């Protein structure tokens, strides 16, 4: 294989690095299944011997592109035996977005020199803090005391050595500017906000969402990998059952989140 690129980031940025012409996972899985169902009738010759079967030529694929939304549409064996599936084709270039651990580990074992790329998100700078200092009182009415605490909390992200996320807890009654403050920070940095409404999930659903389930089920880790922004709003966090709070300890402390299918790090994020 000529090129192997593993990309971690949003679909929008992934689309910028892939070629215009390619074949995707859904297409090749369909072709593989179709070939597997083809029956061949082999007739012996006059001596009763069966002719030797010609070695089947692999299907040539110049550019094989796998987007993160395709994993949910294939069977489990494609994920768990991805390298065996890949071996059915003569692939020149492989581009894969946000692969589950089962796939990425197989690829890196076979191709240890694969090019692993990460999306570069916009970062908070001192100029952003100056703008917040100038505008906040006019954007979020009645929260003058919040501004100073907000600036103090965000300042560490402007330092080069600081890689861990900053975690902010906005609490209080409805309508006082909690959500608007989060949106305002994202707007200042120039990125769309990543928002998850935790009150929408029931306990059983939430456990699967947080800790990971089958590869075709939604998960928080996959949503984080697919995000367009490094500003995260976990709305109505208090509505989640306290037993689930432990899932966020490592994320809030070190910027690391993992479930049974994915592993990721959040650097210089605002949560």
Question: What does each model-found stretch correspond to?
Answer:
Residues 53, 65-79, 226-253, 270:
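Conserved AAA+/SF3 P-loop NTPase catalytic/coupling segment centered on the Walker-B
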Residues 188-216:
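AAA+/P-loop NTPase substrate/partner-engagement loops
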Residues 89-90, 163-164, 189, 204, ...:
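Short loop/turn elements that form and flank the Walker-type P-loop nucleotide-binding site
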Residues 2-29, 162-196:
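Walker A/P-loop
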Residues 142, 150, 179, 210, ...:
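Conserved RecA-like P-loop NTPase ATPase core
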